[in-house]
């Protein structure tokens, strides 16, 4: 199998080794919608990622980084910079496919699910990878230096302040996340590699909103607000202080809760294929999206997927009205047309139409 530049491999390994202990996910207080949206995307990555907007210092980055410890290790082909799956052809690089076809022995290793941060000043070459045209013309080989999309394959790609990122780069990220492949073309030379990841973006609305066309392509959207309750704020400060004082002992206190949630997620992933949505629920969801004047069908598709993931998370097989109610705002609010003359809150509008269609009023059940 093709050997890649060792300096690149060392770079990847060093970044992996430098990852510091993350604050435990189950120790986080508040921000329930953000945590739920992330978990549902882990259960079914086809939901399409999460975009969270909120005040500075509300824990957006902390929540995302704490998610990694809930994810199981993955099997990858050794010395392959694309995190190729040794079995699934859809998650293999071309080099691994060719090696398997030729009967070459494939060595595997287990790694932590990759979590890649995309820096704000990243160039397209840094994100997608670069082709050494000179070497390709002289040696006749496709000399490719993988980018961040290669590292993020089968993992999570996190973009903080995504609303400040160049629209062209956001388009590239969304295209790769949706299609599962990254294509790099230079001077008639083309490289294609798997790039299947959960895209998570965050930002501060005071610094500008994401364009509606791009926002619509994120599966779920969460508005995060600063926690106002004094007792909750004190509890957050105390937990952070205890974690900073001794991360090891703090993590040990949450080991059971972490393992419990991790098992719930793994079980939900396994049972997801068995969850069926009754036809009438599909009709009701479609009517909800139609009455809200949502453009396109992404809202319908994402809501159906998220409902199934939520049911699986709760160890059930049957969809209930309250399941749709719980997740609909996460899937639909960012797809609503903004009318500056309307005084009614958009999320309240969703609730009103939901009640009319589903005839469901016991929203606390």
Swiss-Prot record:
Gene3D superfamilies assigned to the protein according to its UniProt record, in alphabetical order: Magnesium chelatase subunit I, C-Terminal domain, P-loop containing nucleotide triphosphate hydrolases
UniProt key word Chloroplast: yes
Pathway: Porphyrin-containing compound metabolism; chlorophyll biosynthesis
Sections of the chain in a coiled coil: none
Summary of the function given for this chain in its UniProt record: Involved in chlorophyll biosynthesis; introduces a magnesium ion into protoporphyrin IX to yield Mg-protoporphyrin IX.
Similarity field: Belongs to the Mg-chelatase subunits D/I family.
Protein name, entry field: Magnesium-chelatase subunit ChlI
């Amino acid at each position: 199998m093709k050997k890649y530049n060792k300096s690149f491999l060392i770079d990847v390994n060093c970044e992996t080794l430098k990852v510091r202990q993350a604050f435990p996910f189950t120790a986080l207080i508040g921000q329930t919608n953000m945590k739920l949206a992330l978990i549902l995307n882990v259960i079914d990555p086809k939901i399409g990622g999460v975009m969270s907007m909120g005040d500075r210092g509300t824990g957006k980055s902390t929540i995302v980084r704490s998610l990694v410890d809930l994810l199981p290790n993955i099997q990858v082909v050794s010395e392959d910079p694309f995190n190729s799956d040794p079995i699934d052809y859809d998650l293999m690089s071309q080099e691994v496919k060719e090696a398997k076809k030729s009967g070459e022995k494939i060595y595997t290793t287990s790694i932590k699910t990759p979590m890649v941060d995309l820096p704000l000043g990243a160039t397209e070459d840094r994100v997608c990878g670069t082709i050494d045209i000179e070497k390709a013309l002289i040696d006749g080989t496709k000399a490719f230096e993988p980018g961040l999309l290669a590292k993020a394959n089968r993992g999570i790609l996190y973009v903080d302040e995504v609303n400040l990122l160049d629209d062209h780069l956001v388009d590239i990220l969304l295209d790769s996340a949706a299609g599962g492949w990254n294509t790099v073309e230079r001077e008639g030379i083309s490289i294609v590699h798997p790039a299947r990841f959960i895209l998570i973006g965050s930002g501060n609305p005071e610094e500008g909103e994401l364009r509606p066309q791009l926002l619509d392509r994120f599966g779920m959207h969460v508005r995060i607000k600063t926690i106002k309750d004094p007792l909750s704020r004190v509890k957050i400060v105390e937990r952070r202080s205890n974690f900073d004082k001794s991360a090891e002992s703090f993590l040990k206190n949450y080991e059971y809760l972490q393992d419990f949630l991790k098992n719930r997620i793994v079980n939900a992933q396994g049972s997801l294929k068995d969850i069926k949505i009754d036809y009438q629920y599909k009709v009701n969801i479609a009517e909800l999206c139609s009455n809200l004047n949502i453009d396109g069908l992404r809202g319908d598709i994402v809501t159906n997927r998220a409902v199934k993931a939520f049911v699986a998370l709760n160890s059930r097989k049957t969809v209930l009205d309250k399941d749709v109610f719980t997740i609909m705002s996460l899937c639909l609010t960012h797809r609503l047309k903004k009318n500056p003359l309307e005084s009614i809150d958009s999320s309240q509008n969703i609730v009103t139409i939901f009640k009319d269609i589903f005839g469901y009023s016991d929203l606390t059940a």
